[in-house]
Design a protein with these regions (language model features):
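Short acidic (Asp/Glu) and glycine-rich catalytic loops that position anionic groups and cofactors
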Residues: 56-63, 113
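A glycine- and small/hydrophobic-rich beta-loop-beta segment
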Residues: 52, 58-60, 93-94
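A short, polar/proline- and glycine-enriched secondary-structure boundary/capping micro-motif
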Residues: 43, 74-78
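A conserved regulatory-domain signal marking ACT and ACT-like small-molecule sensing domains
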Residues: 78, 83-197
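Substrate-binding/catalytic subdomain of NAD(P)-dependent oxidoreductase enzymes
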Residues: 1-45, 50
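Structured core elements
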Residues: 16-17, 31, 54, 64-66, ...
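Glycine-rich phosphate/pyrophosphate-binding beta-alpha loops
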Residues: 61-63, 67-73
Length: 197
């Protein structure tokens, strides 16, 4: 929503739809979601039809691959090119290795992974609401790094933005579920994870 884009901008972030894939101890963690990224980061500068892939490996560090890949023309061109190459036999192993050489990996939930997050709550502007919200954070062991309350007297509600310290994804989701069921909530809460780079 526009309010989240504006809030992100004020906090020094941009919102990007990012995909992540990590291999840790033979376990694959994959996720795709909107992410708050610092405006100063490289990935924040990728706009328009450009896409980027950042590979972080040991000992080489980060490698960046960037090119056109969004929008109807760029996407169609890339798909037709890849399919043509595979059909012509130019790409023998589309996944870089033969099917026999592939090994089975375990896919893991991100519930136990830790993230810093941006949460926004639209609530009735009345006494006790803020303390009720912060108590739910405390009960779920989610530490608040920053809290911003923007009252809107004409509509008698308030927008509360919370930035958290690193917390378990499972705990962040519990906070959202417990708060959204409260009678003082006027709109579904928003959660956006914050990227580290």
């Amino acid at each position: 929503e526009k309010i989240d884009i504006d809030n992100a901008n004020k906090l020094g972030y941009k919102i990007k739809l990012l995909g992540f894939s990590e291999l840790i101890n033979n376990q694959v963690f994959q996720r795709v979601h909107p992410t708050l990224i610092k405006k100063s980061s490289y990935i924040a500068s990728i706009d328009g039809v450009l896409n980027a892939v950042i590979v972080d490996g040991y000992p080489v560090g980060q490698s960046v691959i960037q090119g056109e890949g969004a929008g109807p023309e760029a996407t169609t061109s890339a798909l037709v090119s890849d399919i043509s190459s595979i059909l012509r036999g130019n790409i023998k192993f589309p996944f870089s290795i033969s099917n026999k050489e592939r090994k089975k990996l375990n896919y893991k939930s991100i519930d136990d992974r830790y993230f810093s997050a941006y949460l926004r709550f639209e609530v009735l502007d009345k006494p006790g609401v803020l303390s009720n919200i912060t108590n739910i954070f405390s009960k779920n062991k989610v530490s608040i790094k920053r809290l911003i309350q923007n009252p809107n007297k004409s509509k008698k509600f308030s927008s509360i933005v919370v930035i958290t310290h690193n917390s378990k994804n499972k705990s962040l989701n519990k906070v959202i579920k417990q708060i959204e069921n409260k009678s003082f909530v006027v709109k579904k809460p928003k959660l956006i994870r914050i990227g580290s780079s």
